[in-house]
A protein has these predicted regions:
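Conserved subregion of the PPM/PP2C metallophosphatase catalytic domain
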Residues: 1-119
C-alpha cells in the first residue's frame, strides 16, 4: 500500500499493467492560504512492477511554436507506448519527446521528472 498526499501539484501517475491512475487526493498547495483548510490522504494498492512518475508543471505546460501545450494526454501516451522496463529509458523518452515537441521555443519553467518502479 502507498499512502500519499497531493499538495496542489500535478498529479503523480501510477501505471500497472497498462492501467494508469492519477494520484489526486490531497489538498490545496502548501503556502497558498494562511491555514490549510483540509488535507486528505490517498491510499492505493501497489503491485510489483508498478511505475510511479512525478513531474512538475513545467513539463506539461511547455509550449511549442504554435502555442500548444505538451499536455497530460501527450505525456500519458508517451508513458504507455514507451519501454518502461528501465526508468532511465522512460525518462529519456519523455524528455526527448518534449524537446522535439517544443521545436524552437525556449523552456520557460523548471522541469523535474522522477520515476521509480516498485519491486
Amino acid at each position: 500500500m502507498l499512502t500519499y498526499i497531493n499538495a496542489g501539484h500535478n498529479p503523480p501517475l501510477m501505471i500497472c499493467s497498462n492501467t494508469l491512475l492519477q494520484l489526486t487526493t490531497g489538498g490545496i498547495g502548501v503556502g497558498m492560504l494562511p491555514e490549510i483548510p483540509r488535507i486528505r490522504e490517498g491510499v492505493v494498492h501497489v503491485s510489483p512492477q508498478t511505475l510511479l512518475l512525478c513531474y512538475t508543471d513545467g513539463l506539461v505546460e511547455q509550449k511549442n511554436d504554435e502555442g500548444e501545450d505538451f499536455g497530460m494526454d501527450r505525456l500519458i501516451q508517451i508513458i504507455l507506448q514507451s519501454d518502461a522496463s528501465e526508468m532511465k529509458k522512460l525518462n529519456t523518452s519523455i524528455i526527448l519527446s518534449l524537446d522535439k515537441f517544443k521545436q524552437d521555443m525556449s523552456y520557460v519553467d523548471d522541469i523535474a521528472l522522477f520515476s521509480c518502479k516498485f519491486l
